Structures are given as C-alpha cells and as structure tokens.
Amino acid sequence: IIGMKEKSRVSQYDVVYHSPGKSDRSAMPLGNGELAVSVWMDEKGVLRFYLARTDAVTELDRTVKLGMVEVRTAPGFLSDGDFIQRLELEHGIVHMKSCGKELWIWVDDASDIVYVSGRMKQEMKVKVRYYTWRTEKNLPWNSPVRSTGLTEAADMVDELEDRICFRHINGENGIEHLARLQCVDDLSCVPDLLSGRIFGGIMYLEGGRRVGHELVKGECTDFCLKVATHSAQLEEKEWLDRVDGMLKGSRTADESREATAVSWEAFWKKSYIFVEGDKERKPVCNERILDCVSEPMECTGTASPVTRGYLLTKYMLACCKDGNFPVFYNGMLFNLCPGNREHLGVMEFVSGFTRIPCGEYPTLSINPDERSWSNEHLWQNLRLPYYTMLATG
C-alpha cells in the first residue's frame, strides 16, 4: 500500500513550467481514460486545449480531435515574470498561477466533462470560444479511400443563448469498399462502428451568455467552464438530449475536483516503482529531438530519470486507456499539429518534433488530426503504449 512518503515522491515528479508556451508543443496531458485533453497557455495569456476521445472516429475511420477551446481573460492572465504551470500528477490536474490569478483544468473522473475553474483577486471578464478546422467537407491528403469519391462531412456548430454545441455527424463510409478489396462478400460479419456515429459536445460557461461566437461572463472574480463530450451511434436529437443531460447532472467544480483528486490518488496507490541510483544517467534520446525541447521545464526534486519516465508514461496511458475504443497509435490521444506546416508522412522523421509553431490556429489541411503512419492498427503504430502496458501489468 502506498503511504504518505510514496505519495509525496509521486509529487516530486510533477512537471513545472515557468513561462508560457510558443505553440501546442507546450501542451500538458489530462484525461479520465476516455476523454483526453492537451492544454497549454500561450505567450499572449490565452488558455487553449484540444479535446480527444478514443471513439471520435469519422466516416473514413480516422480518430480525430473534437476541436479546440480557447479561454481569454480581460485584463490578460499573464503578468511579467510571474507565471507557473504545474501538472499535478497525484491529482490529475493542471494548475496555473500568475499574479493573483489561478486556473485549474481537469477531466472529471466519472463523466466525460472537462472543467476549467478560475479565481482572480480583481474582477475580470472571461471569454470562451470553440474552434474547429473541419469547416467544409474534406478528403484527407493521405486517405486510403481516395479512389472512392468519399469525403468527411464538415462539423456542425450551434451557437445557442448560453452554450455552444458542436458535433460531427458521420456520412457515407468506406466499410463496404474496403471489405470488397479484402474479398469479403458477407458484410454482416464486418462490425460497423461508423454509420450514424455522432461525436462532439456542449460548452457551457456558468453565469455567462453568448455574445457573437463566444461565451462571455462579465466582471467576476471566479468562473467555471464545463465542456461535456459524447460519441455514439444515435439519432441526432437523442444524442443532443444525452449530452444536455450530462451537463444538467454534472457536479459542481469543487465536487468534481475533489472527487477526481481522490480517484487519481487511488490510482497511484495500486502499484508503484521508484528507482534510485541513476541520477546522473543521461536520457536515451536522439539529440536532435532533445534540442527541440526549449520549455523552461523542471521536475521538482527529480532523483531518477528512469522513475520520471516511468511515472509520466504510466500517467499518460491512464489518461486514455479505458475508453470505448482501444488505445490507438503511439501518440495515443495526444498527437499535436505537424511542425513547419509539413505533412507528417512526407517530412524527415525528426523534424516532426520541431518547436517551430504551426501557426496560431490549425487549418483544414494542417491540423492535429494528422498521424504520420496512417490510421491502421498496425504493430508499429501501437508498440509504444502496448509494450508499456504489458510492462506495468
């Protein structure tokens, strides 16, 4: 059983930033097993995060993001020389502080809802916006069904009085085409997990209202943003009712944060490994990849690079390994935008880790939906998470 000493040792490996990021390469991971979030604070003081689910799968069988959320405060969140961002491993929370302003971001342990809670010493205005780059029907550049004429439908966004609803509704898919290519004539034996699938969510800012394309809360010293997500093969109205019900039945921010922290503490109690005697060990990693890491990052009290790697990998796996669909791809649900505005499949391998920002916003052609080794569950696309899961029992 893990005791207080071991719990404090987990916290020693919290990841800490002392300045905001230059791009989504600065993102920290969060998740509850199904819903995963990549969150970062940019140099303008804007909080951004991607949403991802294991079962957010398009009609072309691509595992994609649900979109991106942006949170702004006025006055801005950042103050010169006073910023700290911590990934609290023990509690599964990202905590940011800057001169009397604090943000907490987490994924609820019992429902697929992202919470962003803020507290400020002085009154501020809060603005929240949802972005999707799938704004028109599209055929991804490396799609294996290019010859069929199939495309992915555009996402739908409804801007309501006090919330924003976003979703992707799968259109015609390529299951029959791909089955024929494999000489499978009896389609009844081929599971269809794509037809009629809807994935997305509803974004709600407590005490706020919609102004233009944003949810806005006037002068306030605290706020709570909830983003409820869902994916299922349902009729559209039933899907909307289900997500709306998730919001109505959701916990308060304090209840959710406390329960989620307890859940993560229980996770770390199940098993643990702490290695000693390797403090001087150099990371086994391509130097050109290490050169791309320019964040002023620290792991407080890190005594063991091996332990750090083990704990951080175990944490990331826990964020997305218990979903409706299996863990997919080496990057799991935390893939980011390609660097240099180059498609991943045609660039030199190491340049995929570039720190050069892809631009402020993803586009229809360059976005974090992209994966360099296509979408199949091939061994080379799965070896990193599954080897690790085997090693951790």
Please describe what each predicted stretch is:
Residues 310, 317-318, 382-393:
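Carboxylate/His-rich catalytic cores and anion/metal-binding grooves
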Residues 366-374, 378-379, 383-390:
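Zinc-dependent metallopeptidase catalytic helix centered on the HExxH motif
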